[in-house]
Amino acid sequence: MNEEYDVIVLGTGLTECILSGIMSVNGKKVLHMDQNPYYGGESASITPLEDLYKRFKLPGQPPASMGRGRDWNVDLIPKFLMANGQLVKMLLFTEVTRYMDFKVIEGSFVYKGGKIYKVPSTEAEALASSLMGLFEKRRFRKFLVYVANFDEKDPRTFEGVDPKKTSMRDVYKKFDLGQDVIDFTGHSLALYRTDDYLDQPCCETINRIKLYSESLARYGKSPYLYPLYGLGELPQGFARLSAIYGGTYMLNKPIEEIIVQNGKVVGVKSEGEIARCKQLICDPSYVKDRVEKVGQVIRVICILSHPIKNTNDANSCQIIIPQNQVNRKSDIYVCMISFAHNVAAQGKYIAIVSTTVETKEPEKEIRPALELLEPIEQKFVSISDLFVPKDLGTDSQIFISRAYDATTHFETTCDDIKDIYKRMTGSEFDFEEMKRKKNDIYGED
């Protein structure tokens, strides 16, 4: 412990573990500590079920109907991986895929007028969908063809649109798309949580829709993947990688002090010993004075004994409740997985509802989602503060990750990882290396 390291990492959340893995691969000497006795920090998967009851201070033991406690791995933060997204690229680049198996999420659904509809995943499904009328479908198809052909580097594909200036609102107008289709596109395909994007330049939205389409094209049922045994496998996979490249790991280490001299971090004190470092990466829980609260997320873990109604008995799915449908500013999300992913006892389903808190009564805000899940066997409610670092860390060399947001995928987490990497090293995070090792990561069905 009393040694000199290039980088010390505090917390074993996904952001920290990926950065720790990448720094080790890059030849840095890394010490990685966590004050908790388990991996994953805020993004852990809790097992056995008894521990989840304790964590949420529920009295007594889980009932016998819940099956064996150790058959459960319950994610605290519900997220899926976009099949063609940045996290999958990071998994391939680092070959962490060899430690994990994935399944495709069976379907994505959208809420409209109190009912849920499947988000079409093929042209045939789109034509048969009752989400929009026939003429609307034709216009929508034209729009999707435009998006598919759009290439930032080729102005011939712009058709009079300036990707850096034209707003997304104007692009929708160009294709004469109605409000329902706009809601559906912005929230179910581009996966925006609010409507703020409408007046921004259209380039980002078009790229988001492309990511959705390309991810969907990989496996056909939905654009999402999920690891067997839960999301807690992700940080552990990257922690293994770090260890292979010489990183040192210590769990259950109380952090007494982060030592700063002349405004720069020089080490970390734990159990009376000091480990020295040039740079520090940590999550907000280790540096309360260096982060600020920018909002809250409510998450409700629901245990069910049945698949969600109107999902065709899917054993996994995502449901998006667009804000316009329930008079809110931000969308409500439901992520559902089950015993099929080795995260619950036989015949049991886990549905996690999440959204950005907007009122003094967050539990009321998510009622529309809970109604879709009835009957619910057991609920676990958490309201988490969203912390972000107060500064970039370039002066102190203390680089703080952002709290996990309410989105149902890891794209924003990956943006944070790339951003921290750039601030730490001065160079862009480079995916180019990955192309050499590109292979499919889809586990057996």
Curated annotation (Swiss-Prot):
Protein name: Rab GDP dissociation inhibitor beta
Localization in the cell: Cytoplasm; Membrane; Golgi apparatus, trans-Golgi network
Quaternary data: Interacts with RHOH. Interacts with the GDP-bound inactive forms of RAB3A, RAB3B, RAB3C, RAB5A, RAB5B, RAB5C, RAB8A, RAB8B, RAB10, RAB12, RAB35, and RAB43; binds RAB3D to a lesser extent. Interacts with DZIP1; this interaction negatively regulates the interaction of GDI2 with GDP-bound RAB8A.
Topology term for the membrane: Peripheral membrane protein
Principal subcellular localization: cytoplasm
InterPro entries: FAD/NAD-bd_sf, GDP_dissociation_inhibitor, RabGDI
Lineage: superkingdom: Eukaryota
Keyword line: Acetylation, Cytoplasm, Golgi apparatus, GTPase activation, Membrane, Phosphoprotein
Organism lineage string: Eukaryota, Metazoa, Chordata, Craniata, Vertebrata
Residues bearing the modification N-acetylmethionine: M1
Residue positions where Phosphoserine is found in the record: S130, S382
GO function terms (MF aspect): GTPase activator activity; Rab GDP-dissociation inhibitor activity; small GTPase binding
Family according to the record: Belongs to the Rab GDI family.
N6-acetyllysine PTM sites in chain numbering: K112, K269
Described purpose of this protein according to its UniProt entry: GDP-dissociation inhibitor preventing the GDP to GTP exchange of most Rab proteins. By keeping these small GTPases in their inactive GDP-bound form regulates intracellular membrane trafficking. Negatively regulates protein transport to the cilium and ciliogenesis through the inhibition of RAB8A.
Record-level GO BP terms: negative regulation of cilium assembly; negative regulation of protein localization to cilium; protein transport; small GTPase-mediated signal transduction; vesicle-mediated transport
Modified residues (N6-succinyllysine): K57
Pfam family, one: GDI
Biological source species: Rattus norvegicus
GO cellular component terms listed in the entry, alphabetical order: cytosol; Golgi apparatus; membrane; synapse
Tissue-specificity statement: Ubiquitously expressed.
